[in-house]
Every structure is written in C-alpha cells, then in structure tokens.
Amino acid sequence: ASGSDENDVVVIGGGPGGYVAAIKAAQLGLKTTXIEKRGT
C-alpha cells in the first residue's frame, strides 16, 4: 500500500454502530474508511 492508502481506522459495516464509530473517529481527527457490503 502506498502512503495515500493508509488509514487510522477501518470500520466494517455501516449499521448504527459502524456509522457512529466512523463519525466519532473522524471527529477525533483519525483518517477513517467505512466499508459496507451493500451499494446505495
């Protein structure tokens, strides 16, 4: 992986818990990626 692909947090699942975890991590300044199996 290149430096631009690095994350501090990877959240698997966009349900209620994953959604809150991803938002909180981003608010704390962590580079965050959320992965969801279903498209929108």
From Swiss-Prot:
Domain of life: Eukaryota
Any single GO CC term annotated in Swiss-Prot or TrEMBL for this entry: mitochondrial matrix
Gene3D superfamilies in the record: FAD/NAD(P)-binding domain (3.50.50.60)
Gene Ontology molecular-function annotations: dihydrolipoyl dehydrogenase (NADH) activity
Co-factor note (free text): Binds 1 FAD per subunit.
Catalytic class of the enzyme: oxidoreductase
Keywords: FAD, Flavoprotein, Mitochondrion, NAD, Oxidoreductase, Redox-active center
Quaternary structure, from the entry: Homodimer.
Name listed for the protein in its UniProt record: Dihydrolipoyl dehydrogenase
Species assigned in the record: Solanum tuberosum
